[in-house]
Amino acid sequence: MALVRWGLRRQNFHLLRRRRVLLLKLTVVVISVLLFCEYFIYYLVLFRCHWPEVKMPARGGRQEPVLKAMFLADTHLLGEIRGHWLDKLRREWQMERAFQTALWLLQPEVVFILGDVFDEGKWSSAQAWADDLHRFQRMFRHGSHVQLKVVIGNHDIGFHYQMSKYRINRFEKVFGSERLFSLKGVNFVMVNSVAMEGDGCTICSEAEAELREISRKLNCSQEQVQGSSQCDHEPRLPLSAPVLLQHYPLYRASDANCSGEDAAPPEERSVPFEEKYDVLSREASQKLLWWLRPRLILSGHTHSACEVLHPGGAPEVSVPSFSWRNRNNPSFIMGSLTSRDYALSKCYLPCEDTVLTTYCAAAAFLLVLILAHFERLPSSFLFGWKLCRSHLRR
């Protein structure tokens, strides 16, 4: 009798031990997959990104300083109306990890977000705006050595007939109202492209007047109005054609000439763009090119990549969305800029499909592990499983 009891206790001990081993295996697999998909994958993918090299002619016997800038667009932080909590959690964690990893690995000096920071800024209440802003500041936190500049987008203040002084002031109170500034000898102009409707509305007229004043300052710095009294007391900007940053792209008929893995899907590229909705109007685009004479234009809004050469030789780069919510393969632009030259490269983030496939593969592996433990696999699979285990133990 004592021998039988001893045998039962030993059997129970082995069963308990096997269950503990199974639980340990399951825990290790789950934690490993979570760490890889939610943390380490960002380092593995972004580690391949490098700053482009810009030509460095000596200027006065010394090298020109190079500004390292990141350009991203259309983060679309969800609000209280259209934002499901799981959607918020998933997509905001993706953007936070991508941004923080990029800051740590790439060490940019300035980051530009080209509009549509928020998805519901066009109708959010004061409390909803404060909540969305708090989440944004947590996700895109940065050290004092990095500057963050944000361009106004239509989802931040509304389309032309939705925007108001209140929404614009609310946005500028947080992100600043500066339109023209210089960093390391590079001039930047940030445009409220939503206000480029051209219908003479108060906000539109003020925006155009501000751009004409910026044009005058740039002309004074480039000594194109020599001897003019209006330039006598004007502080000179660096002698450099500006980089134009805005949310809406300049006018183009469609994305038909755009290419690349992050361009719009082939079936959408030939769909004509609507002026003042998908892109700026022809007239507004011509005004910006004439007033500012930019050497480079960067825009967002379309959520897809495109490169366009405008009349006069001004190149425009449309930056894809930074969020999985808008595309499977988000990316951002890395720019090395001097006062006379620039070089751009693209840095891709992890694809959402890759992460989901990894989770599905891990779930299938866990299922096989559990079925093998309880010997519920078909005989052929069970034989193969035992064969693999015996081979690994050698």
Curated annotation (Swiss-Prot):
Q: Which GO terms describe its cellular component?
A: endoplasmic reticulum exit site; endoplasmic reticulum-Golgi intermediate compartment membrane; Golgi apparatus
Residue numbers binding a divalent metal cation 2 = 74, 116, 247, 303
Q: Where in the cell is it found?
A: Endoplasmic reticulum-Golgi intermediate compartment membrane
Keywords tagged on the record? ER-Golgi transport, GPI-anchor biosynthesis, Hydrolase, Manganese, Membrane, Metal-binding, Transmembrane, Transmembrane helix, Transport
Query: Where along the chain is a divalent metal cation 1 bound?
Result: 116, 154, 247, 301
Question: What Enzyme Commission number(s) apply to this enzyme?
Answer: 3.1.-.-
Report the co-factor binding details: Binds 2 manganese ions per subunit.
Source taxon at top rank? Eukaryota
**What is its cofactor?**
Mn(2+)
- Membrane topology, record value: Multi-pass membrane protein
- Say which enzyme class the record assigns: hydrolase
TM segments? 27-47, 354-374
Major location (coarse): endoplasmic reticulum
Q: Quick check: keyword Membrane in the entry?
A: yes
SUPFAM superfamilies xref list: Metallo-dependent phosphatases
> Which Gene Ontology terms cover its molecular function?
GPI-mannose ethanolamine phosphate phosphodiesterase activity; manganese ion binding
Q: Name one GO biological process term.
A: GPI anchor biosynthetic process
Report the PANTHER family cross-referenced here: METALLO PHOSPHOESTERASE RELATED, METALLOPHOSPHOESTERASE 1
Stated role: Metallophosphoesterase that catalyzes the removal of a side-chain ethanolamine-phosphate (EtNP) from the second mannose of the GPI-anchor protein intermediate. Participates in the glycan remodeling steps of GPI-anchor maturation to allow an efficient transport of GPI-anchor proteins from the endoplasmic reticulum to the Golgi.
Quaternary structure, from the entry: Interacts with GPI-anchor proteins (via the GPI portion). Interacts with TMED10.
Q: Which family does it belong to?
A: Belongs to the metallophosphoesterase superfamily. MPPE1 family.
Q: Please identify the protein, giving its name as recorded.
A: Metallophosphoesterase 1
